[in-house]
């Protein structure tokens, strides 16, 4: 804090500069209240003379009176003022003429801090007694039954005074109250005004402060003292008889709010001035310059930056501030006794790029530097690869756009595109943003894609994105698979539909004429099949359709003709009939041979080389229930055939079915005797062969559907219904 060098001018202030002193208005008698009908004399005087020189102007309730004497008499109540040639208008004096019986009078003039005399007066004062005085409704102490009292150190407030008394009316005492009285207290001195030789002094120059006031000319003997302040700090030595304070040199620290106080030496009255703002001006700074490190203002995100602001000249404390284009508030501010200052910006970001300037201010006005551009290069962020296709699921032939974009990164940015680990190509984004690469899709384009971005500050790779290229189905081929070349009722028909190309899953639909038979979804290759147990109604045109969501493809039509007889029933019936016919033929042959043999044994029979007739009845017909044969080593005489036993050599015969129909073919080896009787029988040992054929019965109560179902259920078993058992031996073989 600088030392104050004070020069006190010991000249008391008597008047405010440039303002003429007020005229003085006096009353005679010196009471401001009188009874109605009485007269009061008004006297106008100036400071230099007891009476006014020249014309005197009188005003009653602000209206100019025609009287121009320095002394007048009045009988009307109101506010009176006067003015002379060498003075300004006096303060107003209110004179009251009361019609009341009791009045309260105050001595005039009365100034702030004076002791004032109050007098309670009745029209017939001799018959008035027991007077009491009140202030604001409260009785004043020691004021009972007094003709007059003194009120000490009055002030300019709104206090109301009145008095009460008893009036003698014949033999009665009547209490009477006066009207309230507001004492007209005049200012002892005016409110002070602080004046400075300059409100904006130059730093280092002197300044004079004056606390101006005006003492009432009617109280020239009153002594005043003065004190000056800056903000809340007392200047100089405190209270002084001089209203002036001279400061040899003003500095910026002396800027602030100034005010002063004036009081009587008795401390009875004190008044304060309004505040005045004084700012000390410095030698202005010049040639402000901004420098940036690293030199040139080229930075990479994450580096530190230093902004250096300097001035070529300027005095005192300088306030430096740094600013960026587009920001309202400054980046920083420093105040110091120096010609330069630095601002450190740590870990610069992309938002720190732009134009900068600095300002220097030493309480005069800020001086700005030139603009400097700062460039912050941003390494690319991890790019994001996105696919842009005409539809949600890409299809062969679609034009796919691969878009790679880094949300952060200084341009230019070079983007490279990859399928699996193979480079597809690259594209540059000169002004930032993303880049695209187009592909016309084939099935081979399915797989993982990625991209990377590089702006020279380090490449960044995207996450892999998987692409599945969907292949539309080709035209399907419908194949009919039946047990035989000709489809018959009861066959199990397989409809097989297959598209050789197309992405899975594929939904296959099967149609008979225009009716939908059903559908099957295939999640892998090989097509799909649909089975039908055929009836005559299944003849007609068949087709199928393949669809994987990219458009259905229809097969060519295949025609099927179903014949009316069931394949199983026809086979079994034919086998039964064939077996029966063969059995009859064998029996007939056996009978002929037997007859031939008997004919040869009879006298006169046929010779071995001749042909003789024989009766078929002479040959014994074998039993149809148990087949047998003759051992050729036995005697040849005729005897009954021994019963035949079958060897247990049955295979693939369905014993569980209760409805088989069997046919039996068997041959008999005869003895010599039998051979002679049955010449047509074979003479050599032969194996007896038995053919079994199962013929299914048709149930009368079966519907067409049930019959078809039965046929399908036993379709595989029917394939084993035609079997041969190799041998059946005669009992004699054992």
UniProtKB/Swiss-Prot annotation:
Listed under subunit, the entry gives: Interacts (via phosphorylated ITIM motifs) with phosphatases INPP5D, PTPN6 and PTPN11. Interacts (via ITIM motifs) SYK and ZAP70. Interacts with IZUMO1R/JUNO. Interacts (via extracellular domain) with IZUMO1; the interaction replaces IZUMO1R/JUNO as IZUMO1 receptor after adhesion between sperm and egg.
Task: Give the residue ranges for region: Disordered.
Answer: 603-655, 695-734
* Disulfide bridge partners, by residue number: 44-82, 120-163, 211-260, 309-358, 404-451, 497-544
Disease as annotated in the protein's UniProt record: Rheumatoid arthritis: An inflammatory disease with autoimmune features and a complex genetic component. It primarily affects the joints and is characterized by inflammatory changes in the synovial membranes and articular structures, widespread fibrinoid degeneration of the collagen fibers in mesenchymal tissues, and by atrophy and rarefaction of bony structures. Genetic variation in FCRL3 may influence susceptibility to autoimmune disorders, including Graves disease or multiple sclerosis. Graves disease is an autoimmune disorder associated with overactivity of the thyroid gland and hyperthyroidism. Multiple sclerosis is an autoimmune/inflammatory neurodegenerative disease which mainly affects young adults and is characterized by destruction of myelin in the central nervous system.
Function noted in UniProt: Promotes TLR9-induced B-cell proliferation, activation and survival but inhibits antibody production and suppresses plasma cell differentiation. Enhances activation of NF-kappa-B and MAPK signaling pathways in TLR9 stimulated B-cells. Has inhibitory potentional on B-cell receptor (BCR)-mediated signaling, possibly through association with SH2 domain-containing phosphatases. Inhibits cell tyrosine phosphorylation, calcium mobilization and activation-induced cell death induced through BCR signaling.
Give the way it sits in the membrane: Single-pass type I membrane protein
Keyword Protein biosynthesis belongs to the record = no
- Keywords on record: Cell membrane, Cell projection, Disulfide bond, Fertilization, Glycoprotein, Immunoglobulin domain, Membrane, Phosphoprotein, Receptor, Repeat, Signal, Transmembrane, Transmembrane helix
Q: Mind giving the lineage of the organism this protein is from?
A: Eukaryota, Metazoa, Chordata, Craniata, Vertebrata
**Any one biological process term the GO annotation gives:** positive regulation of B cell proliferation
Protein name, UniProt field: Fc receptor-like protein 3
Q: Which SUPFAM superfamilies match?
A: Immunoglobulin
Q: Which residues are glycosylated?
A: 561
The UniProt entry annotates the motif ITIM motif 2 at 660-665
The record ties this protein, via Pfam families, to: ig, Ig_2, Ig_3
Q: Where are the transmembrane segments?
A: 574-594
Q: Name one GO molecular function term.
A: kinase binding
